[in-house]
């Protein structure tokens, strides 16, 4: 269902000749919490993150869990020019990040995670949902490689990383 919504919203960007953005969020430090505190705590953390994401997204945007500790937000109707759309997408990413990295208290334990975000600006010309996710994923891994809690916007001139430089989880999801 998430992918159907994404397809519909991406088509709307093309119809309205307006830029949107696909944001791919990956939690920094989730695996460690899940491994050390257990899957129940990890599941609670994912539920809390999903709630925070839902509360902090703009009303016109859609959000969903892609899988594991990755989430997607599709921000639409950002602007009619690329520069302004990039600025707005970056501000949206930072706002989401601020809400997600707030500590979570569970049974007296303070859980702290980070969030790296890759952004694929959606031009008024249509690209496939799979390509948009793949390119947002590339930007997200660049953000993660530069530093935790990073935000990176994909640009088509960026070289695509080799399959060896992408973690096994991501390769499995993208079919590499």
Where are the model-predicted features located?
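PAS/PAC or PAS-like capping segment
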Residues: 27-28, 157
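Conserved long alpha-helical elements within nucleotide-processing catalytic cores of c-di-GMP signaling
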Residues: 1-21, 28-55, 64-68, 72-73, ...
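Short conserved AdoMet
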Residues: 58
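Cyclic nucleotide signaling catalytic output domains
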Residues: 63, 91, 95-99, 105, ...
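Residues immediately flanking
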Residues: 27, 77, 117
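Two-component histidine kinase transmitter core
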Residues: 77-80, 156-158
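Short, well-ordered beta-strand segments
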Residues: 23, 72, 118-120
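Residue-level recognition of strand-loop junctions within catalytic nucleotide-signaling folds
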Residues: 35, 75-79, 101, 122-123
């Amino acid at each position: 269902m998430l992918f159907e919504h994404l397809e519909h919203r991406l088509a709307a960007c093309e119809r309205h000749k307006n830029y949107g953005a696909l944001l791919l969020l990956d939690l920094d430090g989730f695996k460690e919490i899940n491994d050390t505190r257990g899957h129940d705590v990890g599941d609670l953390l994912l539920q809390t993150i999903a709630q925070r994401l839902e509360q902090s997204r703009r009303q016109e945007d859609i959000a969903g869990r892609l899988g594991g500790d990755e989430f997607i937000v599709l921000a639409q109707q950002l602007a009619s020019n690329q520069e302004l759309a990039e600025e707005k997408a970056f501000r949206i990413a930072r706002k989401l990040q601020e809400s997600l990295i707030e500590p979570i208290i569970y049974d007296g334990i303070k859980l702290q995670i980070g969030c790296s975000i890759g952004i694929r600006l959606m031009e008024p010309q249509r690209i496939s949902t799979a390509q948009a996710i793949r390119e947002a994923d590339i930007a997200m891994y660049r953000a993660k490689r530069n530093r935790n809690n990073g935000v990176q916007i994909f640009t088509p001139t960026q070289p695509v990383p080799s399959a060896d430089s992408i973690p096994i989880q991501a390769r499995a999801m993208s079919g590499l």
